[in-house]
Amino acid sequence: MNGVSEGTRGCSDRQPGVLTRDRSCSRKMNSSGCLSEEVGSLRPLTVVILSASIVVGVLGNGLVLWMTVFRMARTVSTVCFFHLALADFMLSLSLPIAMYYIVSRQWLLGEWACKLYITFVFLSYFASNCLLVFISVDRCISVLYPVWALNHRTVQRASWLAFGVWLLAAALCSAHLKFRTTRKWNGCTHCYLAFNSDNETAQIWIEGVVEGHIIGTIGHFLLGFLGPLAIIGTCAHLIRAKLLREGWVHANRPKRLLLVLVSAFFIFWSPFNVVLLVHLWRRVMLKEIYHPRMLLILQASFALGCVNSSLNPFLYVFVGRDFQEKFFQSLTSALARAFGEEEFLSSCPRGNAPRE
């Protein structure tokens, strides 16, 4: 469920003194069962968060999918938000397995399920992030180059570009399908990334785990968090700057949805990425390959990030105009206003408003 390797060989397989800071290792070797450390009430709280995300995410994104297919006109915006809702819907569907993993305190579904599940999770994760970038860039181009957008911004091209986003997401998560495996640690089976060979010595194996962890964590942080965040934020700034130059007094309005989306993305996913970096630091500096409490904290921060996917449908509807006004509208009209940028287009200077 995390973006980096989580399991290692058992204590007896490693050279003495390699993991000098992992005191939990010797303490647990006398137990034949799977024992895991707890961090207060973090495990049950994580299960509650995942449960809420499953219900809200499946229902909310499912409703958006149904309405964009059957109740709304097919435009560039509805194509983009359909694929974003699909990615969030897929991520929400995968959460029951994540919850089972956390409750069981170990991976019990086998190696191939480990490969397929983690690949599916990160396909949804990267697709959602890349689609947010795609939507932001699309709206930015529509504002900065309205004439070009009028001639080239078509539903067919948007569909092909969205398909390309899914291919990019598949490429970004393909390493999980090849290198994910399972291994027991202190009686607990975990699903983790393994770039190494079982025939290597313990010291070489440790170095391989750390090297793979560095590559995976930095790549995930840049491609799955910092990069999308920078692009979305830049697009929001460029939109507002262009409209201010053209004398639109309500320049903050079209920026509002992008601002809320990027803020929600940052708030909910930043803990997960910070924990990833802390986990990397502990492995590189403290030579700590595995720590059960860090694994639980990583799982909890991932659960918090999943809340973002379940909230996106509500952000589409309730951001842009006053909540009270949209609450009494039909849902179709509210989504149309969000996806079609009705309030933005109707307020742009005439002749400059981009069209679908």
UniProtKB/Swiss-Prot annotation:
GO terms for molecular function: complement receptor activity; G protein-coupled receptor activity; N-formyl peptide receptor activity. Residues 68-78, 138-156, 242-257, 321-356 are cytoplasmic. Gene3D superfamilies: Rhodopsin 7-helix transmembrane proteins (1.20.1070.10). It is found in: Cell membrane. One of its GO terms (cellular component) is plasma membrane. It is a multi-pass membrane protein. The chain crosses the membrane at residues 45-67, 79-100, 117-137, 157-178, 221-241, 258-280, 301-320. Belongs to the G-protein coupled receptor 1 family. This is Probable G-protein coupled receptor 32.
